[in-house]
């Protein structure tokens, strides 16, 4: 009589120890630096980092406007969290929403003049904090290596943003 032993399923392949160590360091660095930036921005400007980030991303976009889906891909919030945040910012006049002309289900977030002024008032202090907690800690070579590695991660993981038909390709004359 043959004895059949049940073999355990093989462990799925996982990250190498180096990858796990890098991942943990990335998470910890992200947490401690963003908490420090948040604390200082709220203390000096009464502006949470997520709100600053939305205002900044809009200010960097053409015409100060982005599709909500595009904005969600650029900030530290879920799409539902971004919707609630944009509603709050709209309520205090820092952004406004516009319907996408070619897709009524889609919307743009647009930076207002008041929003641009609010961002400008917060920017100098925030940039000093970024320099203190980030720029002063790494040398130029470390900064460039980190930028290249992070850009590679973004490119490998960023989903293609949704857009209005007019965002996808410019109209042909």
List each model region and its residues.
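Short, locally clustered residues in the helix-turn-helix/winged-helix DNA-binding domain
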Residues: 27, 56-60, 123
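Base-recognition residues in the alpha-helical recognition helix of bacterial helix-turn-helix
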Residues: 24, 53-57, 83-85
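N-terminal helix-turn-helix DNA-binding core of bacterial DNA-binding proteins
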Residues: 35-78, 164-167
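N-terminal leader segment of winged-helix/HTH proteins
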Residues: 1-45, 92, 172-173
